[in-house]
């Protein structure tokens, strides 16, 4: 694949999302340093425009805003941990009238409310008297589903300082935005997207996949294509399994998974070990074209590419 091709792919992705109204900004030459919902620093080369005002290469004072009825984001935790790292941050928990009748509010509910001008106005009016010396305001990543840039710009205009999102627990609203845009793009190109199906198995003839078999509502369906991409993840995503003896394999095409043979070697004694956890680095070995190969580098399936968490050496947690 190579760094150049990765850069080209990311540039194409940026063009796609720019034209779709949800820009991803950055380059592979330099990372943004963005705050997490724990107040830690998360490096990333590309990020939605809605998150960029939170870049921690700037030391502008921050106000971290949460909502009393939204229990998946704790502004004090974010602010305290940022303060401990030398940043200036205060927390603010809001009681907005539209939320007072709710004991618990979900991220989806909040995002839908932020899509309405009335809710944004009430939030801005609650923040302004308590803005103080803050030069930017951070929210949980719930600033609308349909038109996040419109929500962002409206809040910035009303509050008078830059606004940014901080991603947190699933369901991820930024992830839903990305998913929706990608689905629309695939469908506009003539593709089909199936939701609620589980791919169970495959049919392979002479080293080539002839179909994959999915199931939904107790009905199976065969899917035919010239080429297939495996993006089912590793052990965490259910794309790989292992038996009690330690033998690991991928679940759809029964591809061999490279993992420590001894189960006692799957984990390091320290959770935060610099080397990560060996079992989460387990995966499928591929050639330079991402086609799966066996331990002797011999090709296994000609019309299959493996990507993401299913790849050997990729550690989603480290």
Please report, for each region that a protein language model flagged, where it lies by residue.
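Residues forming the flavin
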Residues: 1-8, 15-318
